C-alpha cells in the first residue's frame, strides 16, 4: 500500500477545502500568528535604546514604532490580496522568509536609515498573518469556522500582550540587537515549519492582480456585514489601544510605582483574557453572535469603569489608602478589556469569513486595515487625553469609545 501524500490535495474552490483543519494544524496557526504579530507590537519599549544606539534624533524616535505599523498597512493593501491569486503555502513561506531577512538586517544595521528601512519592510511582510487567518478559516468546516478562527485569534492576542514584556526582558539582558536577532531566527524557523506542514491551497478567484486591487472598493461597498463589524472593531481597538497606551504611564506613578519587571507582570496578567477567543467562536457557530457581541462590549464598559475607579478614584475609591486593592482591580480591568476586545475580534472575524470564499483574503485585509486605523487613532488620542486630564482623561476616552460600540449593537438589533 502506498503511503498517503504528505500534503493532501486541496482543490481550487475554497469551500471544498473544509474539514482539513486538524488540532495540530490549529496549534501551528495560532503559534505562527503569535510569533509574527510580535514583529509589529514589540517596538515601543525599544524606542529609547534603539534611538540612543543609532543616534536617532528625539524628534524622529517615534519612527522606530511607527514604521513597522506603516509597513504592515502597505502589506495589507498590496500583498494580502495575492492570497486570492497565488498558492497560499508558497506565498506565506516566501513572505515570512523575507520578513526574517529584514529582521536580521535590522539586528545588524549600523545606521538609522538602514534600520528604519528594515523594520518597515519587516512590518510589510508580517502581513503573512492575514494570509494564515483566512487560510485556517477556509480549511475549517463551516459549522466550526468560528471556533477555528477563535483559536487562531487567541494566538494574535497572546502575541500582542506578550510582545512588550518579551522585548523589555531580552533588551534588558542582551540588548536590542539580540531581540531582533531572536525574532529573525524565530521567523526563519517558522517559515520552515509552515513549508513542512501547511497544505497546498490554490485560490479560485480567477482575477488578475490589478483586478484584485481594484475590487477592494467594490467589496467594501457591497458587503454590509464587513462594514458593520469593521467599524465595531475599529472603535473597540481604539479603546483597547488607548488603555494600554495610558496604563504604562499610570502604573509608574504613586501609589503603584511599578518598575519594568512589575510592568511586564501586569501585561502578562492580561493574557488571561485571551481564553475568551475559542468560546466566542463557538458561540458564533451556534448562531448567537447578535447576543454575544453586546456582551463583549459590556465587558469593555465594566473594565473601563473599574480602571477609572482603581486608577483615577472614580466613585470615591481611596486609592492611596488601598494601593494593593487598586492594583488588583486594575489587573481585573485589564483582563476584562482584553476579553472584550478578543470577543469582538473573534465574532467579527467569523462573520467576515462566512462571506464570499473567493474574496476571503481581501475581506480580511479590509477588516484588519480598518480596525488597525482605529487602534492608531486610539493610541494618539490617549496621549492627548493624558496630557489634558491624566489617567482619568484616558479612561473617559475609553468609556466613550466602548459606549459607542455598545450603542452600535443596540442600533443593529433595532434594525433587525
Locate each region found by the language model.
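Structural signature of the two symmetry-related core transmembrane helices
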Residues: 90-104, 184, 291-306, 399
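Cytoplasmic helix-loop-helix junction between adjacent transmembrane helices
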Residues: 119-155
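Intracellular juxtamembrane helix-capping segments at the cytosolic ends
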Residues: 127-140, 342-356
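Conserved MFS/SLC helix-loop-helix module at the cytosolic interface between two early adjacent transmembrane helices
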Residues: 74-112
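Helix-to-loop junctions at the C-terminal end of transmembrane segments
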Residues: 75-87, 275-289, 386
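C-terminal transmembrane helical hairpin of 12-TM major facilitator-type secondary transporters
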Residues: 291-344
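Helix-loop-helix hairpin linking two adjacent transmembrane segments in secondary transporters
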Residues: 151-198
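Juxtamembrane intracellular "pre-TM" segments in multi-pass secondary transporters
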Residues: 10-19, 198-231
